[in-house]
Amino acid sequence: MSKNRSSLQSGPLNSELLEEQKQEIYEAFSLFDMNNDGFLDYHELKVAMKALGFELPKREILDLIDEYDSEGRHLMKYDDFYIVMGEKILKRDPLDEIKRAFQLFDDDHTGKISIKNLRRVAKELGETLTDEELRAMIEEFDLDGDGEINENEFIAICTDS
């Protein structure tokens, strides 16, 4: 299998990525290389990219495969996946990432994170928190005193500002 991470240990991309980001790329590839052949086909690539937070149109994914597929097999090997995803991760706008995270909490699209939203996320993460604990979390960061966390308050939490 071509998932040899040591071959990618040199180069500018490698020095810019955090260890956690490198691990996420490796895990996404490994998880979605369904037949363990060391390559991702279109469908595997699409879900691996989505797992890393990137949803590209079909045409763009096919173009990426064509760009890196020197053998005409319509597959992407790990080294190429690492390069493509590493570059995409480094180009991410941190503010966009925070806003995307906010949307995961705000599943009812009210523009605010309520105790109900927080309870759902805690449950999804396997955390058992009382309403009192959830309320305390919201009160800690609720700058306008409305009992909920709006997007600006969430951004402030995530950026320590």
Curated annotation (Swiss-Prot):
InterPro entries per the UniProt record, alphabetical: CALM/Myosin/TropC-like, EF-hand-dom_pair, EF_Hand_1_Ca_BS, EF_hand_dom
SMART domains: EFh (SM00054)
UniProt key word Metal-binding: yes
UniProt: Ca(2+) 2 binding residues: 142, 144, 146, 148, 153
Chief place of localization: nucleus
Record's GO cellular component terms: cytoplasm; half bridge of spindle pole body; mitotic spindle pole body; nuclear envelope; transcription export complex 2
Keyword line: Calcium, Cell cycle, Cell division, Cytoplasm, Cytoskeleton, Metal-binding, Mitosis, Nucleus, Phosphoprotein, Repeat
UniProt-recorded name of the protein: Cell division control protein 31
The organism of origin for this protein: Saccharomyces cerevisiae (strain ATCC 204508 / S288c) (Baker's yeast)
Encoding gene, per UniProt annotation: CDC31
